[in-house]
A protein has these predicted regions:
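Segments forming oxygen-rich coordination pockets for charged ligands
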Residues: 1-104
Length: 104
């Protein structure tokens, strides 16, 4: 976790948000394990874990997790399907992502 990330969290009080962190990658991916981003219930984010369709899929999953009041969720994002190729995201890898709800 970098300094900006910690400062961002410390400036928020009485907020519920999700932290999405890449646990593991396989093949070519835009970001590697350990990269995190914050997702708010309204879908706004702080940070990035790769951009594009993959990041949007993770963002939507985090918003869903928050709305269901889950404590955590693990998802896998595959970056080599037809949609990814059409959007120019031809990394060809996959990311395992941990989404954890935080009350700060």
């Amino acid at each position: 976790m970098n300094r900006e990330f910690v400062e961002y969290l410390s400036e928020r009080t009485k907020h519920t948000l999700a932290v999405a962190t890449i646990l593991h990658t396989q093949g070519s991916t835009p970001r590697k394990a350990g990269t995190s981003m914050i997702v708010h219930p309204d879908g706004s984010i702080f940070g990035t874990i790769g951009g594009g369709r993959a990041e949007n899929e993770i963002r939507l999953s985090a918003v869903d997790s928050l709305s269901k009041k889950e404590t955590h969720r693990r998802i896998q994002v595959i970056l080599d399907d037809d949609v990814a190729v059409k959007e120019g995201m031809v990394c060809g890898g996959q990311m395992d992502v941990w989404i954890e709800t935080q009350n700060v």
